[in-house]
Amino acid sequence: MSPLDRTPPSLRGQDGEGSVQVHQDETAKIEGAKVFSVYGKGGIGKSTTSSNLSAAFSMLGKRVLQIGCDPKHDSTFTLTGSLVPTVIDILKEVDFHPEELRAEDFVFDGFNGVKCVEAGGPPAGTGCGGYVVGQTVKLLKQHHMLEDTDVVIFDVLGDVVCGGFAAPLQHADRALIVTANDFDSIYAMNRIIAAVQAKSKNYKVRLAGCVANRSRETDEVDRYCDTVGFNRIAHMPDLDAIRRSRLKKKTLFEMPDDEEIVQVRKEYIRLAETLWNGTEPLAPAPLPDRDIFELLGFD
């Protein structure tokens, strides 16, 4: 049986009975652009992956907008070279009167013309990240910033399954998961798959695949993917050059042409081409927690 023919397992907390959702404003739909949301375990390298992917799309001649969806607001700093103000910060300055804002107040130019926005978020333990994402998209539409955009990338906070996690899925065509060749990262990926599968019952989003990041090998990632019917669509090795690029506040496309960096750039370009050309909508069957331990646990 094809993985696409499997019925996803019944999940507690899925859309429907007992599920509290941040509902999409119909006027805030993103139309015309291809939209990708990037997920993964906290600290796995989502921002590095998102920024270099945005840069790769721009090198292919695409008009790109990256939206950081984390209160840390560091998603785009390798594109812009700085920590830019968040939408929430800017709204506070005008006492939450968005009509007083100009696009240049919250949209910043990054490497090779990539447009950069940091949605920000409420202080820890307060507010709703989903509301912040929704307001950011609404502002972008009001200022016509989405009309001349080919690709939108949402870089989403950690592996928290809440309104902030779900809001980008309301806009995305495909969800991409950043993982590594270790138990904790794959365990988080399994839970993210379950959450995205639940959301895809009501939204158009489908899973595109995963990126093995900061990993010398991919054997455990591949074993998991083979088991659940998922795909690894890129591999970014564990290179010190990638860490150096982040310390220098630059994308890999701005770093010296070392052989290792050139190879990783090629992988990002290949990933961008794969996503632009379209990926098969995957429907993996996430494993129960006990089965994950049995699959990946030590003998």
Swiss-Prot record:
Binding site for Mg(2+): S47
EC number in record: 1.3.7.7
Residues the entry annotates as binding ATP: G43, I44, G45, K46, S47, T48, K72, N213, R214, P237, D238, L239
GO process terms (BP): light-independent bacteriochlorophyll biosynthetic process; photosynthesis, dark reaction
Chain sites annotated for binding [4Fe-4S] cluster: C128, C162
Metabolic or biological pathway, per its Swiss-Prot or TrEMBL entry: Porphyrin-containing compound metabolism; bacteriochlorophyll biosynthesis (light-independent)
Cofactor note: Binds 1 [4Fe-4S] cluster per dimer.
SUPFAM superfamilies linked to this entry: P-loop containing nucleoside triphosphate hydrolases
InterPro entries: NifH/chlL_CS, NifH/frxC, P-loop_NTPase, Protochlorophyllide_ATP-bd
Assigned protein family: Belongs to the NifH/BchL/ChlL family.
Family matches, as PANTHER family: LIGHT-INDEPENDENT PROTOCHLOROPHYLLIDE REDUCTASE IRON-SULFUR ATP-BINDING PROTEIN (PTHR42864:SF2)
Official protein name in the record: Light-independent protochlorophyllide reductase iron-sulfur ATP-binding protein
The species this protein was found in: Roseobacter denitrificans (strain ATCC 33942 / OCh 114) (Erythrobacter sp. (strain OCh 114))
Gene encoding the protein: bchL
